[in-house]
């Protein structure tokens, strides 16, 4: 499109946006921003669509970062009017999950985490489910840590004889003796309601206790069970009292494992966030009756330009939309909430209290600065930082693994290799004006260095400077003799050099009867040479295959240079010692191994020198440095 054509189009688009802004209602709802391709790039919620959407287009000089970039890409928008803020919040959450807009913070979905369910049926069962359904059952969770979930299930199993069968225990089925008791009854894991051996009233009292336990009310349960045990004892029902005593002991052991973090016994949720350049982590502590029952992590992507306060609000909205936990008395925060954010959350709480028949509470939001509560927030923040660091390490590893795989796949395709080059060996030569000629061989397996298979070679078949002869020697020594049996064959050989080095290496392999794919990588303009092609070719600078080849070539060069410097240093150090009468290279090297340096040899006592090299040699060295 010519620039003259584009300008009127932009003007028309801006005019259409202005007209559309004038039609917005002052109602709660969700808005979607689209780019010129029609793709949804941002989804937001508002209690007043007119004010919220218009705010993006007023005073654009005050916008910065991601929001400014977003506004420059808005070509159109759509709104969906809802009946309440809570409905807008739910709709926004679902749309972000489905559409994954570019400029929205992406919060990791908890849909894979399990819930505990008390089923809605006569004689309810306790089940684990990963899918929530509105079927009248009572739901708890999600449980982000399987250890916590199984710990609770083990406790329930040790205290309460809940049925595990799938029988439909209607009054008619029980009365007609349709079912028989199973093994659980005989090992005292169930009281046999299927045969009418336990009344529904007694069973539901047990379910009420389990519900109390799952809500974290262990202290209340202990008091209740203690009273019941004492009552049965007074009524001389000692068998029932002993049964409750065993339940109490299990419950107390479970309660002792829970960390007491607040002495006032209140129910609290604690929120904190930690952010990096692009990612963040929110942590929620669930405190019930002063005990820390568990925590939940919510990871976030695309957080660049977002404030900690805004991210904290997003974490809270997601958590309370999805959790089935009982609402707390108090919420401790790392950052203060904005007025709109607090209003949205309170509306959500009211909806949850109504839908889930929870006790109505006037929940307090606090940002503590000192004392026990501030310590809880700081502990939560430290956990968020720790989990974010772990997440970033794993993300980096996943990224590296992906790049390595892409690099190997690209190499296979570009070089028409018969299989993925899982093992690659790379060679490099190093010398200084023909002296101390060395070669290195490094090995990469699955895109990573395998240092145990690195080898270094001191070239000894000629004197002077001859890169081709050095390449012939190192290829021959690697792929024949003892090394050929100690190390597996590579899927690809890379040599540092051009057409000449590649051809010499290729001819040497042919002489050994080997057919291994081989290429050369020239340093100057990163040209790739193969034995079959007359001319080299180049890879794009961003190619993962080129980056992998460069990494290997540079590693081989580093390894060769390090070995070359070591040999040169030893030779230079030995020169001074070998000027002493009666000392050859072997003796000089032995002295350097023993003392570490020429200076240390010079400072050694006559006794130390005698122990290292014998009396005659020691006397010569001692007199040389002490004339």
Curated annotation (Swiss-Prot):
Gene: uvrC
Main location: cytoplasm
Role according to the record: The UvrABC repair system catalyzes the recognition and processing of DNA lesions. UvrC both incises the 5' and 3' sides of the lesion. The N-terminal half is responsible for the 3' incision and the C-terminal half is responsible for the 5' incision.
One GO location term (cellular component): excinuclease repair complex
GO molecular function term, any single one: DNA binding
Regions annotated as coiled coil: none
SMART domains from the UniProt entry: GIYc
Cross-referenced InterPro entries: GIY-YIG_endonuc, GIY-YIG_endonuc_sf, GIY-YIG_UvrC_Cho, RuvA_2-like, UVR_dom, UVR_dom_sf, UvrABC_protein_C, UvrC
Entry's localization field: Cytoplasm
Domain of life assignment: Bacteria
HAMAP family: UvrC
Assembly behavior: Interacts with UvrB in an incision complex.
GIY-YIG domain location: 26-105
Classification via CDD domains: GIY-YIG_UvrC_Cho
Domain (UVR): residue spans on this chain: 219-254
One Pfam entry name: UvrC_RNaseH
NCBIfam families assigned to the protein according to its UniProt record, in alphabetical order: PRK00558.1-5 (NF001824), uvrC (TIGR00194)
Any one GO biological process: nucleotide-excision repair
Keywords, sorted A to Z: Cytoplasm, DNA damage, DNA excision, DNA repair, Excision nuclease, SOS response
Protein's UniProt keywords contain Cytoplasm: yes
Protein name: UvrABC system protein C
Stated family: Belongs to the UvrC family.
């Amino acid at each position: 499109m010519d620039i003259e054509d584009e300008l009127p189009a932009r003007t028309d688009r801006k005019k259409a946006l202005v007209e559309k802004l004038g039609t917005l209602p002052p109602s709660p709802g969700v808005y979607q921003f689209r780019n010129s391709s029609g793709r949804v790039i941002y989804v937001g919620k508002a209690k007043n669509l007119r004010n919220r959407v218009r705010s993006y287009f007023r005073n654009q000089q005050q916008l910065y970062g991601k929001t400014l970039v977003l506004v420059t890409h808005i070509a159109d928008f759509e709104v969906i009017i809802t009946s309440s803020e809570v409905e807008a919040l739910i709709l926004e959450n679902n749309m972000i999950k489905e559409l994954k807009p570019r400029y929205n913070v992406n919060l990791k979905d908890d849909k894979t985490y399990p819930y505990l369910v008390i089923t809605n049926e006569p004689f309810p069962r306790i089940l684990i489910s990963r899918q929530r359904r509105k079927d009248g059952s009572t739901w708890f969770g999600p449980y982000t840590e399987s250890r916590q979930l199984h710990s609770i299930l083990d406790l329930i199993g040790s205290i309460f004889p809940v049925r595990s069968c799938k029988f439909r225990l209607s009054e008619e089925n029980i009365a007609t003796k349709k079912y028989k008791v199973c093994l659980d009854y005989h090992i005292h894991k169930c009281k046999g309601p299927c045969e009418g051996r336990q009344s529904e009233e007694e069973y539901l009292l047990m379910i009420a206790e389990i519900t109390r336990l799952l809500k974290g009310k262990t202290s209340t349960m202990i008091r209740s069970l203690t009273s019941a045990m004492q009552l049965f004892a007074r009524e001389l029902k000692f068998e029932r009292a002993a049964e409750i005593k065993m339940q109490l002991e299990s419950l107390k052991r479970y309660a002792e494992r829970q960390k007491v973090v607040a002495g006032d016994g209140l129910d609290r949720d604690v929120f904190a966030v930690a952010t990096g350049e692009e990612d963040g982590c929110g942590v929620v502590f669930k405190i019930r009756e002063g005990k820390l029952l568990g925590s939940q992590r919510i990871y976030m992507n695309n957080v660049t330009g977002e404030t900690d306060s805004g991210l904290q609000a997003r974490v809270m909205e997601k958590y309370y939309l999805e959790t089935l936990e009982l609402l707390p008395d108090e919420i401790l925060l790392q950052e203060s909430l904005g007025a709109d954010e607090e209003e949205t959350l309170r509306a959500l709480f009211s909806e949850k209290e109504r839908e889930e028949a929870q006790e109505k509470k006037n929940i307090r939001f606090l940002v503590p600065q000192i004392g026990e509560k501030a310590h809880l927030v700081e502990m939560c923040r430290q956990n968020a930082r720790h989990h974010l660091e772990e997440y970033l390490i794993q993300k980096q590893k996943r990224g590296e693994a992906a790049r390595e795989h892409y690099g190997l796949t690209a190499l296979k395709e570009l070089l028409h290799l018969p299989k993925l080059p899982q093992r690659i060996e790379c060679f490099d030569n190093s010398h200084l004006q023909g002296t101390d000629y060395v070669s290195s061989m490094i090995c990469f397996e699955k895109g990573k260095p395998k240092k145990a298979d690195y080898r270094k070679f001191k070239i000894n078949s000629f004197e002077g400077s001859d890169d081709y002869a050095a390449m012939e020697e190192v290829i021959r020594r690697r792929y024949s003799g003892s090394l050929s049996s100690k190390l597996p064959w590579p899927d690809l050989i890379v040599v540092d050099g051009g057409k000449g080095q590649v051809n010499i290496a290729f001819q040497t392999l042919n002489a050994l009867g080997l057919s291994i794919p081989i290429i050369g990588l020239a340093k100057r303009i990163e040209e790739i040479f193969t034995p079959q092609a007359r001319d080299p070719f180049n890879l794009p600078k961003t190619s993962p295959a080129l980056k992998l080849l460069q990494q290997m070539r540079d590693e081989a060069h580093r390894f060769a240079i390090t070995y070359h410097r070591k040999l040169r240093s030893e030779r230079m150090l030995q020169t001074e010692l070998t000027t002493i009468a009666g000392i050859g290279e072997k003796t000089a090297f032995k002295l350097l191994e023993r003392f570490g340096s020429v200076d240390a040899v010079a400072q050694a006592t006559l006794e130390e020198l005698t122990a290292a090299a014998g009396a005659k040699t020691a006397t010569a060295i001692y007199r040389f440095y002490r004339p």
